[in-house]
Amino acid sequence: MKKILATAILAVSAAMFAADENIYGTITDAQGPHKGAVRYSMKSKTYFVTSKQGGALLEAEIQPGDITSMDIVEPAGWEQAVAKVEKGQAAASINYFAGIVKKYNHLQWDLRAARYLADAYLSSGNPDKALESCTAVVRADPEAAYKGELAPIFWKVLVKLGKKEQLEKLLVKAAASGDRYSSGAALIGRGDLILASGESNESLRAALVEGYLRVALMYTDGKIAEQLRPEALAKSAQCFEKIGQAGRADQMRGELKRLYPNSPWAKQ
């Protein structure tokens, strides 16, 4: 890590502080936390954290490989935009999320925004644009295709566009990633992939056994349960209903509404 202390050199940064156009957060490396205005340089492929110290500005340059943690402040308007997507008002949030993807490049929220942008496009009936937004992220970070927040919506886009072979490869990678969230999300993706070929009784049962029901029964604790179980319970209920097991369907829906009443899946 390099540190530069020079008011003249950082005149542009000072102007940005005055205009308050910065992205704020904390990046931690072996030397400790660096808190201030954060930016990523595409030219040098490094992070910069600028902070005020007395009458000068101190800028720390940090290599990605040296970072132990990163915490970027949530963008203004984020919760409202997410709520619109979850309420089925996806089109109203497209411009917002597109702007966040661009502004927060390599600063955590770009991946999260790309996930909601793809979801918004998909909900608006535009899977091609959803694929475009996912592909832009995956091109820069190939691991995002099978691991992390973007992956599940990327898989839904691939299902919608009939790209089953590509999806199959990504699900295998996710299952082998060692990441519990990605492994669980891959099981839901597996169920979606099975049903993409048709909803016969055989395929509905396979989607349950190989996908949805495994998540509903095995991922029952912590944050991952909140992230994955609502969708798994909802889709399990749908499958049970379609194969004529109304009692099991009611059981799944009852558990969904009791444990996750605020989930969009509980309100469908």
Could you describe each region identified by the protein language model?
Residues 108-110, 142-150, 179-186, 218-228, ...:
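Boundary/linker segments of alpha-helical solenoid repeat arrays
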Residues 164:
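Mixed-charge (Asp/Glu-Lys/Arg
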Residues 37, 125, 179, 187, ...:
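Mature soluble domains of exported/periplasmic/lumenal proteins and thiol-rich metal-chelating peptides
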Residues 138-139, 210-217, 237-264:
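TPR/TPR-like (Sel1-like) alpha-helical repeat modules
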Residues 212, 227-236:
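Surface-exposed aromatic
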Residues 18-142, 149-160, 169, 175, ...:
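Compositionally biased alpha-helical segments
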Residues 1-4:
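Positively charged n-region of N-terminal signal peptides that target proteins for export
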Residues 9-18:
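Hydrophobic h-region of N-terminal signal peptides that target proteins for export
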